[in-house]
Amino acid sequence: MLTPILSSASCSWTPTSQFPHSWHSSPSFLTKPLNLPFTESYKTAKRPTPNYSFKVQAMIEKEVAVSHKPDAFLRESDMGSNVTSNSSSVRGRFEKMRREAQDSVCLAIEKADGGAKFKEDVWSRPGGGGGHSSVLQDGAVFEKAGVNVSVVYGVMPPEAYRAARPTDNGNVKPGPIPFFAAGVSSVLHPKNPFAPTLHFNYRYFETDAPKDAPGAPRQWWFGGGTDFTPAYIFEEDVKHFHSVQKAACDKFDASFYPRFKKWCVDYFYIKHRDERRGLGGIFFDDFNDYDQEMLLSFSTECANSVIPAYIPIVEKRKDTPFTDKHKAWQQLRRGRYVEFNLVYDRGTTFGLKTGGRIESILVSLPLTARWEYDHKPEEGTEEWKLLDACINPKEWI
């Protein structure tokens, strides 16, 4: 889940997707040709479709382990006079939001688990930026829970800028372009097969004006989503989860929920199985169609909705009695989760190919999973109902 050929998410960068849904120790979302559509759902977003096939590289500094978590990973120029409140810039406020999201989710998970604590790893980069991984394993309720945050400063080549701005004046030939990227990403795997897995990720990317073209426009975009992967369907749980996502979306635009729900269904598709990883949620990418302030507020609202969408379901299901059969089915569905992340997830596959920070890249994987040869649940069973919903996505609300 969670290095670029910007030096990799660890730190070099061959773009293949502007925003992979997962977040690593460096900006893994910088891994695709900018503005290049890559799924049907992306096409439905009515984005431009230039044909760029080049590969580019960018540079960021190598991360260095540190012993304590700083108040912020921002450069001093991005922080203003009060680090705790941060500057009025979108960079500063998004960085603050992703730290608060990590803290609040970790506290909620520890409380729900009843005793286990997160292990924390922190790193920084000499020129600014850094990251913080929080991972809980073998708790009373959670088999594995990871919540990662990252801030990256780097430089992209002019080819990437031209791809991002195909309508710019062709006579403008900008030089290397500094960029900023920040995000929070999490995957939560409970032990009880009746409690669902949850993934969420929210991120922001911004360029500075090119060094050789100070008048050129600055680029920015948001991406992210929250999705839900149960092993067994409790309709009240699925409706609750989707209702919280819809409520967050509807505060900003009534078109967001249906648009982003479809995008989520399309993205989390396991092609070789012809089924979805789970029961959906919301997903958006390369998103700058609206005012920047509005989209910052929208991303914040979505991140703040994670706990009310998920924790009540975990509290309801964590102590439900289960059998070995239930656990085996959960492990088979965990196998599907592993397949998607290692084969299709853009952040994971990019990080593995570019020598990224492996512990952050693989933090999304469950501790245990299972594969059985030619396993098919009997039609009409609870297991079959879940599989059918993954093959034939439904409208839950």
Curated annotation (Swiss-Prot):
Its main location: plastid. Keywords: Chlorophyll biosynthesis, Chloroplast, Heme biosynthesis, Oxidoreductase, Plastid, Porphyrin biosynthesis, Transit peptide. Substrate binds at residues 185, 201-203, 355-360. GO terms for cellular component: chloroplast; cytoplasm. GO terms for molecular function: coproporphyrinogen oxidase activity; protein homodimerization activity. Its EC number is 1.3.3.3. InterPro entries: Coprogen_oxidase_aer (IPR001260), Coprogen_oxidase_aer_sf (IPR036406), Coprogen_oxidase_CS (IPR018375). Residues 76-95 are annotated as: Disordered. Residues 135-144, 337-372 are annotated as: Important for dimerization. Pathway: Porphyrin-containing compound metabolism; protoporphyrin-IX biosynthesis; protoporphyrinogen-IX from coproporphyrinogen-III (O2 route): step 1/1. One of its GO terms (biological process) is protoporphyrinogen IX biosynthetic process. SUPFAM superfamilies: Coproporphyrinogen III oxidase. Residues 79-90 have a biased composition (Polar residues). It catalyses: coproporphyrinogen III + O2 + 2 H(+) = protoporphyrinogen IX + 2 CO2 + 2 H2O. It comes from the Eukaryota. It is found in: Plastid, Chloroplast. The active site is at 199 (proton donor). PANTHER family: COPROPORPHYRINOGEN III OXIDASE, MITOCHONDRIAL, OXYGEN-DEPENDENT COPROPORPHYRINOGEN-III OXIDASE, MITOCHONDRIAL. Involved in the heme and chlorophyll biosynthesis. Catalyzes the aerobic oxidative decarboxylation of propionate groups of rings A and B of coproporphyrinogen-III to yield the vinyl groups in protoporphyrinogen-IX. Belongs to the aerobic coproporphyrinogen-III oxidase family. This is Oxygen-dependent coproporphyrinogen-III oxidase, chloroplastic. It comes from Nicotiana tabacum. The gene is CPX.
